[in-house]
Amino acid sequence: MRGSDQKILLMVMVVVAVVAAAQGQEETTGFVTWGNNYYQTWGHQALVINKTSELQLTLDKNSGSGFESQLIYGSGYFNVRIKAPQTTSTGVITSFYLISRSSRHDELCFQILGKNGPPYLLNTNMYLYGEGGKDQRFRLWFDPTKDYHSYSFLWNPNQLVFYVDDTPIRVYSKNPDVYYPSVQTMFLMGSVQNGSIIDPKQMPYIAKFQASKIEGCKTEFMGIDKCTDPKFWWNRKQLSSKEKTLYLNARKTYLDYDYCSDRQRYPKVPQECGSYT
């Protein structure tokens, strides 16, 4: 190959590499279908219906089931719509996670706790660098078995927000004195499983997940630090005055348990509790 041809080839390779890196910084926007971003990880074969816009997970006497995303993220807004299993579902847990792959992992989690009728409880939990036990539980103001409802995470360099149907119910703000999830990439995961003894007469239990809206910073070709760029709208996102009102009302009206107030479990208030707004 002539020297001039080698130079041209090298330039082409550089351009391709730059384009690939730039694509790594592109946000994933809009509704992401199950076939495009998710795959089953355990349990029964998931049933994809409604032209890839809906996924069913099954729990029976043999096993539950779960899925996770193919893509990993460094920040973003992550939403899924869930219809929990039928009314009589004591012991059944339907979950949606944002989680990292590490022995000292970070994790955000929604868990719809099955019961034999309303009011149903929604447990939220966090793991910060492998340390869990940070439960906050809410009485849902609707029946999650009757229709689909939205469950969302906002994750940016300044705060983590848990949303239910556009109502913020839990906010964790960055605090220089405590650990904040900003060094580990995370992926999405969902499951239905038994948390205790369940009624075999009610099996199978079927949890339905509708196509999610993902607006996140993908990290295939770059480090997580690039995902803090304010060019991404979610990194500039703060609670609006309306959201603050909804948040305070949800905490006042529907909060059922807060680990930060549990002196039997934690005689000393956990350090990160000062980071909740």
Curated annotation (Swiss-Prot):
GO molecular function, one term: polysaccharide binding
Catalytic activity line of the entry: breaks a beta-(1->4) bond in the backbone of a xyloglucan and transfers the xyloglucanyl segment on to O-4 of the non-reducing terminal glucose residue of an acceptor, which can be a xyloglucan or an oligosaccharide of xyloglucan
Coiled-coil portions: none
Binding residues for xyloglucan: N123, T124, N125, G133, K134, D135, R265
Gene Ontology cellular-component terms listed: apoplast
Positions of the GH16 domain: 32-209
Biological role stated in the UniProt entry: May catalyze xyloglucan endohydrolysis (XEH) and/or endotransglycosylation (XET). Cleaves and religates xyloglucan polymers, an essential constituent of the primary cell wall, and thereby participates in cell wall construction of growing tissues.
Protein's name according to its UniProt entry: Probable xyloglucan endotransglucosylase/hydrolase protein 11
Organism: Arabidopsis thaliana (Mouse-ear cress)
